[in-house]
Amino acid sequence: MKYIFYLLILFSTLSNSQKFDERVDNLIQENIEETIELRHWFHQNAELSNREFKTAERIAAELRKIGYNPKTGVAKTGVVAILNEGKEGPVVGLRADIDGLPVKERANIPWASKMTGIYNGEEVPVMHACGHDMHTAILLSTAKILYEIKDEIPGQVKFIFQPAEEGAPAGEDGGAELMVR
């Protein structure tokens, strides 16, 4: 997780001072437990493509708590927030996929998914089987950390929480293509 945050600042003209590095390291350490808690919540509450309603609500609520004004309903259930909106300079987009898969949870963990959803007309178990829960939690933590140092970022950062990355249900549009329309 630490390396994601360092990659984010490569685009900027920020000082590489030891003091700045220590500040970022401290912010990361301060947010690790919350990131894990968020990941567990998203894992327990996995939703299928274009049905990520609770997921989107939680993402938007977390972003508002930080200080963002997120746009919801993007590409049906996507969420977008912008750091330093309107600020001159480079613009960087960071994306996390938020949908789960029609897969039964087999792990015996306290945060196992017990969610179900309708897939091809049948009720099926749903879980995050390929890391979208982690992607979402890490991007939220990244948004929080960058918000803390926003005055030192010489441009904008767009946080994109994309629904339906695994593919929209039959007969529906969804995913990245809708996000950029």
Regions found by a protein language model. Name each.
Residues 1-4:
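Positively charged n-region of N-terminal signal peptides that target proteins for export
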Residues 10-14:
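N-terminal signal peptide c-region/cleavage motif recognized by signal peptidases
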Residues 19-128, 137-158:
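Acidic/His- and Gly-rich active-site-bordering loop/insert found
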Residues 153-181:
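Fold-level recognition of mixed alpha/beta catalytic cores in primary-metabolism enzymes, strongest
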